Design a protein with these regions (language model features):
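Charge-rich alpha-helical segments
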Residues: 1-99
Length: 99
């Protein structure tokens, strides 16, 4: 995957289509709460597997029953359509998780 940087206007428009994400520090970010620590680890593992497949790797911080995900293009230094594709994937695998 590789796409060009999005403008702030495009980022705001894309954010309106996915729930839970914010634009901050030139990244899109989301915090997700879980009922158990292992549920959070299961999601991190699923994200890691997808990230390897598409070569777009988020920053992930794991806390007890909570993860912080930050998406940006490390190569381009900002948010791209790849970031939003990954965010959409993350939302799809966390829809059924109690937050």
């Amino acid at each position: 995957m590789m796409s060009g940087l999005l403008s702030k206007k495009d980022i705001r428009s894309n954010l309106s289509n996915i729930s839970g994400w914010v634009f901050e520090d030139n990244k899109i970010k989301r915090v997700i709460q879980f009922d158990t620590y292992m549920a959070s680890i299961d999601v991190v593992n699923a994200i890691a597997k997808k990230a390897e497949q598409v070569n777009h790797h988020p920053e992930i911080i794991v806390s007890y029953c909570k993860i912080l995900i930050e998406l940006t293009s490390h190569d381009l230094g900002g948010v791209t359509t790849d970031c939003f594709e990954m965010a959409t994937y993350i939302n799809s695998i966390t829809n059924d998780i109690k937050k």
